[in-house]
Amino acid sequence: GPGGEDGTVQSVLDDLNIPYTGSGVTSSALAMDKKRSKELWQEMGLPTSHFFVLTKETDWIKTLHALGGKSMVKPASEGSSIGMSRVTTPLQLQEAWAIAAEFDTTVIAEPLLEGNEYTVAIVNGRVLPSIRISANHEFYNYDAKYYSDETSYFCPSGLSVEREREIQQISLAAFKSLGCKDWGRVDIMTDEIDQFQLLEVNTVPGMTSHSLVPMAAAAVGLDFDQLVFEILKASCDE
C-alpha cells in the first residue's frame, strides 16, 4: 500500500544508497496508480476494462449506464482493496465515490467483473503458475484477504494449458510494461465472455508463509528459503 509500495520508501533508500529488492521508484509509483497503469495498458493493447474517473460533478445515472449498470469503485492508489465498493444503483455509485475519496483524490469506476479472479506471481523473470481465488464475499475485499477462513485458493488454478499460457503472457507483459523488476504479482479477472482483464500489479506482495507468492512458488518446488534466495538473486544480478 501507500508508503511501502508506491515509491516513497524506495526513494528514501535510493537517496541513502541502500540496495533493496523489487521495483524502483518510478515503476512502484506507476503500479500503485491504477488509473495510470490502465491507461498505459490500453495504449499497449493489453486487456483491461474501460473506466471513468469520478468527481462530485459526475452524472451518476449516465456513468453507471455506461458501465453496464454494475460497477466496482476504487481509490486509484490504495492497496488491499481498501475503499472499494460494489455498486448497482446511481445512489450507490455516488456513495461509493465519497467513500473512496476519503482515501485518494483520484477515484475510478470500472464495469463490475463477475468472473473468476486469478493472481500470477513473477520471480526473477520466471512466471509462476496462476492461482485462482474464491472468496465467499461480494468480492475479494480486505476481510476476505486477511481475516476470512472461507476464502479458498487453487494452484494449479484449473485453467487449460492454452489459457494458462495466455494468462502468464498477459501478466508478464503487464509487469514489464510498468518497468517492474525482480518480483511481483499481477491480479487478473475474467469478464462476462471469459476474457482476461488486468486489474493491477503488486510490486511488494505479501511474503508470509501463507501468502500467495510463496504458494505459487511451492507449486514449482521452491520452498520459502529458495523463494527468498531467488528474489535476492534477481536484485544482485542487475
Predicted regions and their residues:
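Conserved beta-strand edge residues that scaffold enzyme active sites
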Residues: 2, 27-28, 54-56, 114, ...
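Conserved N-proximal alpha/beta basic substrate-recognition cap immediately N-terminal to
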Residues: 1-50
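Phosphate-binding site of ATP-dependent enzymes
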Residues: 88-169, 190-197
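ATP-dependent carboxylate activation and anion-phosphoryl transfer catalytic cores
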Residues: 40-45, 160-238
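Short small-residue beta-strand/loop micro-motif enriched in glycine and branched aliphatics
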Residues: 22-23, 81, 152-154, 209-213
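A glycine- and small-aliphatic-rich helix-loop capping segment at beta-alpha/alpha-beta transitions
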Residues: 9-20, 89-94, 219-222
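Active-site nucleotide/adenylate-binding loops and adjacent lid/helix of ATP-dependent enzymes
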Residues: 29-110, 114-116
